[in-house]
Design a protein with these regions (language model features):
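Intrinsically disordered, low-complexity regions
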Residues: 1, 5, 89-92
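Accessory carbohydrate-recognition regions in carbohydrate-active enzymes
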Residues: 34-426, 430-481
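Bacterial N-terminal signal peptides that target proteins for export
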Residues: 2-16
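C-terminal motif of bacterial Sec signal peptides marking the signal peptidase cleavage site
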Residues: 25-27
Length: 481
């Protein structure tokens, strides 16, 4: 599940994706200028590296440690669907707002939308060619060839922005698939939906799923750049036309909303704000980060942010393959953990309650593959970004404060119980050894380490009845003292 090696391991397997990079479309291109600026380092990042074989990365738009990872879902079934995308695919089921990168298990895929045209079908599926697909840090684009739609994605930390350019003569439609899930054959499923049609350009809701994260929910607000002409809901395949004010609560049916958009030649934009707290939180996040519709401004700012981060390390070599491997790996290593907190400091804790960070500028993070990253990523950050290294450590301790133990693999306010050992303590000990912790931190963290050494079977639901749980509960070291 380690993020860095996949960029090396999957290079040969991703040759088709690398070939596609030569056909980058202008909005998502990343060309070398010949200068030594930080901006120029972006040309060495290839988001398609790792999307083949079992690298389990995705090519979509994101910012460092952002809540949003806006990316196409081309694969839904099995291990190849861990990130939602696989290099071997030629269809797109939807563009969803959250993804895991480089992990051995999949989840998320929250809030799935798809521009389409032509005949109505319950679940339209887009087709694409690799030569018409492009990605660079902060931007992804693809032509949906069976619909004749050029689709581009970019994002802020908590808001995804889609720009769709439909053919002049085509009907303009948009699917919001509230039944979308990755790896349903692994038992992952949508367990409920709240949503409300505020008006003909705004939908708010909360999406509840059961997957690797046993109890996951993501709230959202979806806004259209121009009001829809009409909106229809398919509930378990039965169609009904909606009007403003329509709402459902914890609906367990398969829900798909089809939005029929006005014709026109200008690009159509859709933005989706996220919050793990509430739809109101999603709206606040959108208002704070993307109150307007300036796609190019968002993309440009994303590139600047990534360029600044990549510029923290410079290597000297004439071998462009080494540069591409290195800077793509550095890019991948800053996708997760991601900030699970709203702009006002609110976040959903491991106890599922809502908490408020007294220092919202620091963030609260989730998606820690700790058994991989404790020995490389976290020590690296103490050198190139010690403030961020400390924020990660404090997030792990916050998980302890809310959930009573330090996590092994925290995922969206869930203890997954994944992977053995005790690596949160290694991360905290490294912060102490490098002088990044206060004396109060040391006292608090020592308490967390001691109390977390006692195995909590009730916080690892998926391991009930397994050999691992049986062994641990019989071992005298883990028994309550």
């Amino acid at each position: 599940m380690h993020l860095l090696p996949h960029s090396l391991r999957s290079l040969a397997a991703s040759s088709a994706a690398l070939l596609a990079a030569a056909f980058f479309l202008p909005a998502c291109s990343s060309k070398t200028t010949g200068s030594s600026s930080s901006e120029d380092l972006l040309s060495f990042v290839d988001p398609f590296i790792g999307t083949g074989e079992h690298g389990h990365t995705f090519p979509g738009a994101t910012r460092p440690n952002a809540m949003v990872q806006f990316s196409p879902d081309t694969h839904l079934i099995g291990w190849d669907a861990s990130s939602g995308y696989h290099e071997s695919d030629s269809v797109i089921y939807a563009f969803s707002l959250t993804h895991l990168s480089g992990t051995g298990i999949g989840d998320l895929g929250d809030v799935a939308i798809l521009p389409y045209s032509g005949a109505d079908t319950l679940r339209p599926i887009a087709q694409f060619d690799k030569t018409e697909e492009a990605a660079s840090p902060g931007c992804y684009s693809v032509r949906l060839k069976n619909f004749g739609i050029q689709t581009e994605l970019t994002s802020t930390d908590r808001v995804g922005l889609l720009r769709a350019t439909y053919a002049d003569s085509t009907d303009r439609k948009l699917l919001l698939d509230l039944g979308h899930i990755l790896q349903p054959n692994w038992g992952h499923k949508v367990v409920g939906n709240d949503f409300r049609l505020v008006n003909d350009s705004t939908i708010v809701g909360t999406y509840y799923t059961k997957g690797w994260a046993e109890h996951h929910q993501m709230s959202y607000i979806l806004r259209l750049s121009t009001p829809a002409d009409s909106i229809a809901l398919y509930r378990d395949g039965e169609r009904q036309r909606l009007s403003a004010g329509f709402a459902v609560e914890r609906d367990t049916a398969d829900l798909k909303l089809h939005l029929y958009l006005p014709k026109g030649s200008a690009p159509y934009l859709v933005k989706v704000g996220l919050s793990a707290v509430s739809p109101e939180g999603a709206e606040r996040n959108m208002q704070a980060e993307l109150p307007d519709w300036d796609f190019e401004a968002v993309r440009t700012e994303s590139r600047r942010i990534w360029a600044d981060l990549l510029g923290k390390i410079r290597i000297e070599t004439s071998d462009t393959a080494v540069l591409k491997n290195f800077y793509t790996a550095l890019y991948h290593s800053h996708i997760a953990p991601f900030n699970y907190q709203d702009v006002d400091g609110s976040f959903r804790g491991m106890d599922k309650a809502i908490h408020k960070n007294p220092r919202p500028e620091e963030g609260h993070y989730t998606v820690f593959s700790i058994w991989d990253t404790y020995r490389a990523l976290h020590p690296l950050l103490t050198i190139i970004d010690p403030d961020q290294a400390l924020r990660y450590g404090k997030s792990l301790v916050s998980d302890y404060d809310e959930g009573t133990i330090l996590p092994r693999w925290p995922l969206a306010s869930n203890y997954t119980g994944c992977m053995p050992a005790y690596h949160s303590v290694s991360i905290l000990a490294d912060l102490v050894a490098k002088g990044l912790a206060t004396s109060e931190d040391l006292r608090h963290w020592t308490e967390a380490a001691q109390r977390s050494s006692i195995y909590r079977a009730d916080l690892a639901e998926k391991f009930a009845g397994t050999r691992e749980l049986d062994l641990i509960t019989r071992h005298p070291y883990y028994k309550e003292r």
